[in-house]
Every structure is written in C-alpha cells, then in structure tokens.
C-alpha cells in the first residue's frame, strides 16, 4: 500500500520516511520556559538531523479538577507561539477544544490537534477541516484502531485530507492504559496509509481512582518508545520538562529535558534500522 505523505511546510510526514519529532511541553507554563524548552529541542534535533515540530497546549480544557492549571489561554498562547516561530523558525502544533478556536489557531500554528476525548465531535471536526490546516488526530482511549478510518473520513468529507493519526494508548480496565502495537498498522490500513505517530508521554499515564491528577511511568519512557519505533512510525510525540516533578501538568510522564539527546539517539537508530529493511509480506 502506498503511504500518504502529509507536508508541514518543508517537513514531510509519512510512515516510510524518517520519523518526525513532535515535542515540547505539555502546557504553556510561561513564555520563558517555553522558549527555553524549544531552544533545547531545536539544538538537539538539528544536531541529530531529526525533523522537528514544537508542541504545547495553550489551554488544558479537560483537566480532572476544576482547580488544576489550564494554561495562558488563546490570546496569550498565540503570542507565545508567534514568538517561538519567529525566534527559532520551527513548525508548531497545538490542540483546540472548541469549534470557534479552529480558525484563529490555524492562522498562527501549523498543525492543529484534535484531542482524544473530542475526536468524534463532528462539529469540531468540520470546523478544523475548513481551516485547511494539517490535522493531528489523537486516537481516543475508548476507540479501536480500525474505527479511526471513520474519523479520517469526516475530515475528507470536510475537504481536508491532510490528516495525521496519533496513538496514545487504550483503556485497560479502569485508570490504566496499554499500547497495542499491532494497532499501529491497523490504523495505517484503515485510513489508506495516513501517517501514524505515537504519543509515548500520554501512553504512560496512570491514575489514582480517587485522585485529581494523573500519575505516570516516566521510568519506562525509553522502553515503550523503542517498542513503538520498532513497528515503524511516521513520527514520535513526546513532552519534556527541565523539572518534571514541578511541571503543572503530566509531570510524572514527562521526559527530563536533559535526557532528550540520549533518548533521541536511540530512537533515531531504531528508526533508521527498521526503515532500512525491505518490506516483508508474511500474509501468504
């Protein structure tokens, strides 16, 4: 099957091309921290020759607690993204939660992301499709890989086929996630070869059944990411923080920022190796 290429400016994203890194921080905590984190990602990815897109959220609208930090909001968030793009010359990605946010965000950010909890909301999908922007769809934890074809079809009906899919794990009983590596190729096949990336950060989440914040398995980030890269991915999605234990959102799953380079050295080595192999058809 021919793999679809989705272009983010001069960055080509496809299942059979070198992987693209979608990385940054979970939520915009401050302008200065965002600049610091982006600068480190840019330095490391340029050194290693990895195509890079900066990620952060301007509003975490789905926090468990009403008291949890959500972010700077749309207006201030777009100012930070504009400065990051101007300063570092990077492409950017962020999520939207309401149909009214799609157009103004797409005027600043290069890729707009459809959150997992909202991936079947048709009005939001249609609003995002109308922007013409590249779309990243998070696979809901409660949706099977094969069902992702229906979500992609909604975007195509809305006139936009520039869609990337992102696996972030599936529900495994209550308050736990598991990643079905076989589902990666199921998503590729169900969508006619659309690029599939893997969000290793959020796949590491755990929950206290009665708690108001997510836990995580940061110590296992490398082993889970290595497994994903071995399947063959269009990209890897990861969040990092200089002080994960002090992060305002999802710190327990965040990669320590100073571990980014050795982490990516491993990921690139696996990606290069896997994509050097000829295709092996074992179906017959």
UniProtKB/Swiss-Prot annotation:
EC number: 2.5.1.55
NCBIfam families attached to this UniProt entry: KDO8P_synth, PRK05198.1, PRK12457.1
Highest taxon above the source species: Bacteria
Biological process according to GO: keto-3-deoxy-D-manno-octulosonic acid biosynthetic process
InterPro entries per record: Aldolase_TIM, DAHP1/KDSA, KDO8P_synthase
Compartment(s) of residence: Cytoplasm
Lineage start: Bacteria, Pseudomonadati, Pseudomonadota, Gammaproteobacteria, Enterobacterales
UniProt-recorded name of the protein: 2-dehydro-3-deoxyphosphooctonate aldolase
Keyword annotations: Cytoplasm, Lipopolysaccharide biosynthesis, Transferase
Gene3D superfamilies: Aldolase class I
Pathway entry: Carbohydrate biosynthesis; 3-deoxy-D-manno-octulosonate biosynthesis; 3-deoxy-D-manno-octulosonate from D-ribulose 5-phosphate: step 2/3; Bacterial outer membrane biogenesis; lipopolysaccharide biosynthesis
Keyword Cytoplasm annotated: yes
Main localization category: cytoplasm
GO molecular function: 3-deoxy-8-phosphooctulonate synthase activity
Enzyme class: transferase
Pfam families according to UniProt: DAHP_synth_1 (PF00793)
Cross-referenced SUPFAM superfamilies: Aldolase
């Amino acid at each position: 099957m021919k793999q679809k290429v989705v272009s983010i400016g001069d960055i080509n994203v496809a299942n059979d091309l070198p992987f693209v890194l979608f990385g940054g921080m979970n939520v915009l905590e401050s302008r200065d921290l965002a600049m610091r984190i982006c600068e480190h990602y840019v330095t490391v990815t340029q050194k290693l020759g990895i195509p890079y897109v900066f990620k952060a959220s301007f509003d975490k609208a789905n926090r468990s607690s009403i008291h949890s930090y959500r972010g700077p909001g749309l207006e201030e968030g777009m100012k930070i993204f504009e400065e990051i793009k101007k300063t570092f010359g990077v492409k950017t990605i962020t999520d939207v939660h309401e149909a009214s946010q799609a157009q103004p965000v797409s005027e600043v950010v290069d890729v707009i992301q459809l959150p997992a909890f909202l991936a079947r909301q048709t009005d939001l999908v249609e609003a995002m499709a109308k922007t013409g922007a590249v779309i990243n769809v998070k696979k809901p934890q409660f949706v099977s890989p094969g069902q992702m074809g229906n979500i992609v079809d909604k975007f195509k009906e809305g006139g936009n086929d520039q869609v990337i899919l992102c696996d972030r794990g599936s529900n495994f009983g209550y308050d736990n996630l598991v990643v079905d590596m076989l589902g990666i190729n199921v998503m590729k096949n169900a969508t006619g070869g659309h690029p599939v990336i893997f969000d290793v950060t959020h796949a590491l989440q755990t929950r206290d059944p009665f708690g108001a914040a997510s836990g995580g398995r940061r110590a296992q980030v490398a082993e889970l990411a290595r497994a994903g890269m071995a399947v063959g991915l269009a990209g890897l999605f990861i969040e990092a923080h200089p002080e994960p234990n002090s992060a305002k959102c999802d710190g327990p799953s965040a990669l320590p920022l100073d571990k980014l380079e050795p982490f990516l050295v491993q990921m690139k080595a696996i990606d290069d190796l896997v994509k050097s192999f000829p295709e092996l058809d074992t179906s017959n």
